[in-house]
């Protein structure tokens, strides 16, 4: 859908939108905070240059004057009749600037004119973006015409000052048992979903959209960074079916996509495009915004590709030397201020399941809660495949969640840790060599492990099991019941893919009745 959308829109409405965006560049600079104005925007364009060299996504532009466009300024040129945006990355000397293209450069020729816009990449923001799909440069790709707004913002900006920031300690209830009990999310915080390939990050983030964004009164921004176009397409149509996006009414979500078929320049900047839209709702409308990013690793990966294209010497494991700075500049903008908040949920691909890889390790430092998806748990058929011992949250504090919640969570983690330490003995000697107390620990731990599974609404078409949302009070009460031995008489299968303890008991009694009938 998106590919045809891009080409169809380019034939019809793109020229008019391009003209509108150019007209709006200078007024947009007036909306910037003072530090951002001085650092990221020049007061006026420096005129036209000419394409000097094209090497893949890297384009060199030569100007006739010593006055060159600043780093991060956007240049515009025409490629096969379509607007192509270039972002200035380096000054090479002899009036040449090196740029990264935000789209394919096939067909671009030397000598073509490139105009300085006088500002960074500038995108439409505000209510007009809701229900629309835009790309990294703010052009709509949903075949529904130009975005009609007079509000524009550059994608590069400073993080809010410390005096503007606010810290709150409020739980964001997701309805997912393992998260709400063991690694609860903070409203207005940053949440990371860590996992290797195929362990369920995107399904998990879609369930969070289903559980939180639909019940959430404010606006949401979903940013697809270097992921599958099919998933973005499915998400768009699913949101239409559930009225989160209403084509002729009020929508609650803006979608921003720079998918895996896009050049590295687009993938390295599209997260900033989504963040800029979320910042507008936070700063200008005082909203509590949900920002979903899938996948933040692709942001780092694209930065690594761009760094290599620019000829920088790579750092550890081949990543860009500016890895920590690139991540920090973006993450520091995702924060809660006195005006409003941004609650960010970020999927983080973990290369080769190695959490010490520099990309996920750099991301860890910025997060309030980390949900680690484990391949070992997914191989047991337990979904969501959240590792209850690796997942952490600063919100799991008795002063925030209360004593009952804290004690239940720590007891669950303790019994799972004891089971983990006993597994080697069981593998070598068998269950019979354990003491009675250890046998009871193992039995309860296995039931808890299965009870941490949960049927998802978004996976209902695949599993055939109706999705369950579990209230936090029911989650705590259910795990307390298992720890107290109230489920000792039930088989392990009773605790698999159910909601609360009452559902597990009903399922267990049904299983026992069937077994008695067979006997």
UniProtKB/Swiss-Prot annotation:
Binding site for ATP: 195-202
Sequence intervals crossing the membrane: none
Enzyme class: translocase
Any one GO BP annotation for this protein: proton motive force-driven mitochondrial ATP synthesis
E.C. no: 7.1.2.2
Gene3D superfamilies: 2.40.10.170, Bovine Mitochondrial F1-atpase, Atp Synthase Beta Chain, Chain D, domain 3, P-loop containing nucleotide triphosphate hydrolases
Main location: mitochondrion
Xref: CDD domains: ATP-synt_F1_beta_C, ATP-synt_F1_beta_N, F1-ATPase_beta_CD
Record's keyword terms, sorted: ATP synthesis, ATP-binding, CF(1), Hydrogen ion transport, Ion transport, Membrane, Mitochondrion, Mitochondrion inner membrane, Nucleotide-binding, Transit peptide, Translocase, Transport
Repressor listed as a keyword: no
GO MF annotation terms: ADP binding; ATP binding; ATP hydrolysis activity; proton-transporting ATP synthase activity, rotational mechanism; proton-transporting ATPase activity, rotational mechanism
Pfam families: ATP-synt_ab, ATP-synt_ab_N, ATP-synt_VA_C
Compartment(s): Mitochondrion; Mitochondrion inner membrane
Enzymatic reactions: ATP + H2O + 4 H(+)(in) = ADP + phosphate + 5 H(+)(out)
InterPro entries in UniProt: AAA+_ATPase, ATP-synt_VA_C, ATP_synth_F1_bsu, ATPase_a/bsu_AS, ATPase_alpha/beta_chains, ATPase_F1/V1/A1_a/bsu_N, ATPase_F1/V1/A1_a/bsu_N_sf, ATPase_F1/V1/A1_a/bsu_nucl-bd
CC terms in the record's Gene Ontology section: mitochondrial inner membrane; proton-transporting ATP synthase complex
HAMAP family in the record: ATP_synth_beta_bact
Quaternary structure annotation from Swiss-Prot or TrEMBL: F-type ATPases have 2 components, CF(1) - the catalytic core - and CF(0) - the membrane proton channel. CF(1) has five subunits: alpha(3), beta(3), gamma(1), delta(1), epsilon(1). CF(0) has three main subunits: a, b and c.
Function: Mitochondrial membrane ATP synthase (F(1)F(0) ATP synthase or Complex V) produces ATP from ADP in the presence of a proton gradient across the membrane which is generated by electron transport complexes of the respiratory chain. F-type ATPases consist of two structural domains, F(1) - containing the extramembraneous catalytic core, and F(0) - containing the membrane proton channel, linked together by a central stalk and a peripheral stalk. During catalysis, ATP synthesis in the catalytic domain of F(1) is coupled via a rotary mechanism of the central stalk subunits to proton translocation.
Record-stated family: Belongs to the ATPase alpha/beta chains family.
UniProt name for this protein: ATP synthase subunit beta, mitochondrial
Gene encoding the protein: atp-2
